[in-house]
């Protein structure tokens, strides 16, 4: 044993360490293995090797560690229960061993290594000795340099002396290798920035060249035109186009004729819609030739004809879009017989007949049935258009502005690219340069006609008059009654008015049986049955059934408020004594009729200012000088009348009277002579 310890001391001086696997395997413990890798890593190499050659034994009951097996066995006897005197007497009577007497044991013993149950402590000791021999035979020692395993520490020490101590003394210490020299990384390549200066305002797409930008804008232009065409097919637009106004007037006149003549047109329409109608044309050219040949030049504006509903269209695209409404279920308007593909489109169209204005203009208060017509109307209020061309034209749509600009710079809209230099151009460049003529002055824009009521200006008098009529003038009444000639703002108002001539009252109250000519009158009447007064005065709390009554009542409370027109929005409390305001001179009027009469005065004055100045009229002749009249009388009779511009003396007056008297006597004698003859 002393020799082994001496060899261990020599090995401790070697600069080697055992692997954690050897340290773990060199510590067999009774019942469990003790992991000493953490503790051994903190020791010196000599202490680690010395500790790896000793065994420790653990008590399976309390976990205490002991260096020898005898100490563990003597310690475990403390855990064995003691035998009482009664149990000893019972053991003597039976003649059995104490550990074998039933009832004297608290329970079987269990091996902490393999968890096997054993009846007696003696069998437990024998069983644990078997585990100890197995663990001792499995212990192997590993060389830290060559990773070779040895069953005993003696062989491991001999291997270390023979193989590694001699080679370590012969070889000089090798310095640690230097880290490899890595070449410096190349400088980063400059980033190529792709310039895309043209951004589409519709979808924010970036384009590199003007050609790509204009081609991309063309897609938005086509979609915009398609949407406008679809909107014109399914909806009645209330814009300021003269052609559409003429068509609506013709429709109103035709409907008036229907009511007056008793439906002659409907019978004619049925006859036209029968099988004798025009044949179905397969192409646009055939349809156009057929319309011109059959219906004359008057139908050239709408050459495309629908064979199912007898409607005509101005383009083939509109006819195709209309034809889709007849496929897969249709929705027909009972008022004007128009056909729609979707129920939502029909409901939107019916709002036009009912006179509903869901889209209001915040500038002038006018109402529109569709959002498309409101957007078209809002362009009239734009003071400065967004896009202005150098030729003087202005555009509110950027796409149309770009297409217009292409007319100035060729098809692509980009400046022409420079041609490659030639020999002639090189020779010409060597010659003395001639003075370049000054660039032509840009064309002057046409004179703008300002609006006298707002800061807008227009290029033509027709646009100015249209703007004043639509924005500043009174509401137009372009729909006329064919019976009495009364004008209305909407076609639905004409239809309601015609019922006053025919005596028709289609709307009946279910509560009292009264009939009314319009749905609005019926709705106001039904408030009398329900007792609901939805309009309340914010000052005194009084309620009214109609907004007009509340408006008249509010004039008693509020002072004048500066707004240009009576509000058409729901009740907000902004009313005053004189709600109608003249934007030209600032006067207020109680009624709209008074404001209209007053605005005619301004209109006449503006008409005189717009007319060219005329030549001054000729000066009137000077008035005649005042004359003095002198009457000469004798015996109550006037014998002479003297008129003079200057007063006469009395003597002169007497002489004139005597001369007149002598002349009168002579004439009297002459008359007597002629009488007697």
Swiss-Prot record:
Compositional bias segments (type: Acidic residues): 233-257
Domain of life: Eukaryota
Location of the region described as Disordered in the Swiss-Prot/TrEMBL record: 167-190, 223-300, 408-449, 608-627
Record field: compositional bias (Basic and acidic residues): 223-232
Family as reported in the entry's similarity comment: Belongs to the krueppel C2H2-type zinc-finger protein family.
InterPro entries named among the record's database cross-references: Znf_C2H2_sf (IPR036236), Znf_C2H2_type (IPR013087)
Function noted in UniProt: May be involved in transcriptional regulation.
Organism of derivation: Bos taurus (Bovine)
Biased composition (Low complexity): 410-433
Gene3D superfamilies the UniProt entry points to: Classic Zinc Finger
UniProt protein name: Zinc finger protein 526
Listed SUPFAM superfamilies: beta-beta-alpha zinc fingers (SSF57667)
ZnF (C2H2-type) residues: 57-79, 109-131, 141-164, 198-220, 304-326, 331-353, 359-381, 387-408, 449-472, 479-501, 507-529, 535-557, 580-602
Biased composition, class Pro residues, residue ranges: 172-190, 434-449, 613-626
Any one GO molecular-function label of the UniProt entry: zinc ion binding
Entry keywords, A to Z: DNA-binding, Metal-binding, Nucleus, Repeat, Transcription, Transcription regulation, Zinc, Zinc-finger
Keyword Membrane: no
Pfam families membership: zf-C2H2, zf-C2H2_4, zf-C2H2_6
Gene Ontology cellular component annotations, sorted alphabetically: nucleus
Compartment annotation: Nucleus
Predominant cellular place of this UniProt entry's protein: nucleus
């Amino acid at each position: 044993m002393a020799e082994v310890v001496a060899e261990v001391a020599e090995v401790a001086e070697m600069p080697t360490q055992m692997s954690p696997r050897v340290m773990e395997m060199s510590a067999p413990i009774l019942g469990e293995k003790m992991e000493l890798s953490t503790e051994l890593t903190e020791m010196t190499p000599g202490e680690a090797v010395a500790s790896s050659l000793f065994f420790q034994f653990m008590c399976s009951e309390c976990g205490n560690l002991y260096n020898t097996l005898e100490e563990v066995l003597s310690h475990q006897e403390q855990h064995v229960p003691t035998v009482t005197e009664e149990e000893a007497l019972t053991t003597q009577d039976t003649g059995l061993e104490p550990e074998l007497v039933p009832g004297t044991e608290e329970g079987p013993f269990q091996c902490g290594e393999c968890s096997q149950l054993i009846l007696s402590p003696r069998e437990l000791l024998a069983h644990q000795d078997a585990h100890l021999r197995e663990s001792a035979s499995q212990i192997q020692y590993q060389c830290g340099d060559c990773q070779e395993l040895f069953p005993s520490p003696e062989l491991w020490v001999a291997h270390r002396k023979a193989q590694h101590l001699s080679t370590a003394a012969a070889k000089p210490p090798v310095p640690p290798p230097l880290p490899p020299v890595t070449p410096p990384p190349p400088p980063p390549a400059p980033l190529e920035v792709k310039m895309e200066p043209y951004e589409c305002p519709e979808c924010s797409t970036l384009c590199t060249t003007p050609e790509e930008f204009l081609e991309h804008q063309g897609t938005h232009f086509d979609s915009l035109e398609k949407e406008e065409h679809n909107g014109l097919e399914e909806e009645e637009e209330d814009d300021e186009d003269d052609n559409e106004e003429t068509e609506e007037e013709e429709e109103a006149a035709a409907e008036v004729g229907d009511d007056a003549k008793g439906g002659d047109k409907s019978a004619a329409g049925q006859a036209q819609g029968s099988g004798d109608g025009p044949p179905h044309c397969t192409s646009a050219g055939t349809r156009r030739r057929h319309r011109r040949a059959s219906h004359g030049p008057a139908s050239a504006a709408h050459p495309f004809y629908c064979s199912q509903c007898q409607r005509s269209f101005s383009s083939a695209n509109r006819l195709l879009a209309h034809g889709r409404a007849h496929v897969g279920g249709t929705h027909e308007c009972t008022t004007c017989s128009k056909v729609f593909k979707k129920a939502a489109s029909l409901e939107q169209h019916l709002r036009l007949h009912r006179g509903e204005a869901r889209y209001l203009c915040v500038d002038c208060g006018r109402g529109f049935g569709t959002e498309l017509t409101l957007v078209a109307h809002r362009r009239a209020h734009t003071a400065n258009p967004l896009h202005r061309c150098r030729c003087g034209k202005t555009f509110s749509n950027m796409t149309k502005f770009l297409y217009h600009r292409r007319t100035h710079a060729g098809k692509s809209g980009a400046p022409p690219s420079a041609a490659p230099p030639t020999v002639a151009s090189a020779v010409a460049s060597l010659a003395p340069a001639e003075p370049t003529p000054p660039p032509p002055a840009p064309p002057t824009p046409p004179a703008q006609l300002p609006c006298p009521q707002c800061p807008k200006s227009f290029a033509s008098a027709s646009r100015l008059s249209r703007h004043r009529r639509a924005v500043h003038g009174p509401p137009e009444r372009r729909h006329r009654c064919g019976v009495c000639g009364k004008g209305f703002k909407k076609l639905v108002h004409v239809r309601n008015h015609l019922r006053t001539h025919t005596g028709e009252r289609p709307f009946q109250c279910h509560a009292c049986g009264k009939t009314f000519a319009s749905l609005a009158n019926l709705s106001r009447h039904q408030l009398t049955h329900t007792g609901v007064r939805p309009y309340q005065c914010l000052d005194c709390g009084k309620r009214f059934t109609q907004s007009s009554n509340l408006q008249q009542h509010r004039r008693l409370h509020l002072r004048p408020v500066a707004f240009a027109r009576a509000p058409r929005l729901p009740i907000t409390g902004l009313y005053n004594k004189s709600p109608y305001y003249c934007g030209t001179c600032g006067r207020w009027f109680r009624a709209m009729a008074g404001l209209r009469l007053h605005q005619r005065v301004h209109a006449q004055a503006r008409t005189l200012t717009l007319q060219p100045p005329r030549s001054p009229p000729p000066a009137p002749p000077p008035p005649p000088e005042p004359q003095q009249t002198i009457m000469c009388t004798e015996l109550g009779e006037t014998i002479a009348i003297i008129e003079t511009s200057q007063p006469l003396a009395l003597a002169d007056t007497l002489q004139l009277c005597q001369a007149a008297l002598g002349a009168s006597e002579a004439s009297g004698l002459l008359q007597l002579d002629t009488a007697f003859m």
